[in-house]
């Protein structure tokens, strides 16, 4: 049977070609469901009772040698894009809220406990007296003894919670990372690290001025639980 005929039958039966979602095989569906049905509702209830603010956090990186985008060219003539011969990168940690607030910090070094604590200090300061309920993934540094001790000394100001393992689709900040990379890679490639950082910072500041854009991440079916 010709492939085209198979496609016609599938279309009649209600099937369409779609890009599959990727899900780690280590993910435990029962743990995810428990988070949705029990853990997150408890966090939300506490945040309301304590006049707190729930924030979702994540880290990402931008590299000069990452390739994205396509271009048109005659058959057999691959288009050439001029890029820097040097390799450089910048890292970012950020948080979003379902009210459309966005906070971020750029850093060049590896994410260590002191770097994370520096960002957490900023979150406390920016919260203006409200307690921060911060939801993170299970990166090792998030569970480090230094971070746990630092947060433990500030229980009235900040508390950390953790998503189920291997469940990035539950984190709205992942959608921010995708948004950033899409916007930052448009136009000419950055020529050096400073230019890359300026571009990332510019995109993030524009997004800070568009709370409706941040809120739109929470309309995704996977994130609707947190809207």
Task: State where each predicted segment sits.
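RNase H-like DDE/DDD metal-dependent nuclease/strand-transfer catalytic core used by mobile genetic elements
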Residues: 67, 113-160
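Conserved short alpha-helical interface segments
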Residues: 1-27, 53, 60-62
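RNase H-like two-metal-ion nuclease catalytic core shared by retroviral integrases
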Residues: 29, 137-138, 145, 161-185, ...
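RNase H-like polynucleotidyl transferase catalytic core
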Residues: 21, 77-86, 152-172, 188
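Generic structural signal for small/hydrophobic residues in well-ordered secondary structure
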Residues: 6, 58-60, 94, 120, ...
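Short beta-strand segments
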Residues: 55-57, 132-138, 161-164, 218
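C-terminal anion-handling pockets and recognition modules
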Residues: 5, 50-52, 173-227
């Amino acid at each position: 049977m010709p492939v085209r005929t198979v496609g016609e039958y599938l279309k009649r039966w209600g099937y369409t070609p779609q890009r599959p979602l990727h899900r780690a095989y280590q993910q435990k569906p029962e743990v995810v469901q428990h988070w949705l049905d029990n853990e997150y509702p408890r966090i939300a209830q506490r945040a309301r009772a304590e006049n707190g603010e729930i924030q979702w956090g994540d880290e990402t990186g931008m590299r000069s040698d990452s390739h994205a985008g396509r271009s048109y060219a005659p058959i057999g003539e691959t288009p050439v894009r001029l890029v820097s011969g040097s390799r450089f990168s910048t890292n970012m940690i950020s948080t979003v809220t379902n009210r459309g607030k966005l906070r971020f910090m750029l850093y060049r070094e590896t994410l260590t406990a002191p770097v994370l604590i520096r960002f957490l200090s900023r979150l406390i300061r920016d919260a203006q007296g409200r307690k921060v309920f911060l939801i993170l993934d299970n990166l090792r540094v998030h569970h480090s003894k230094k971070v746990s001790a630092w947060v433990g000394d500030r229980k009235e100001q900040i508390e950390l919670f953790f998503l189920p393992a291997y469940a990035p689709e539950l984190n709205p900040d992942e959608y921010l990372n995708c948004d950033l990379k899409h916007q930052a890679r448009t136009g000419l490639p950055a020529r050096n690290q400073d230019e890359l950082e300026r571009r990332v910072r510019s995109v993030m500041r524009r997004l800070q001025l568009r709370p409706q854009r941040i809120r739109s991440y929470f309309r995704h079916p996977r994130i609707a639980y947190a809207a």
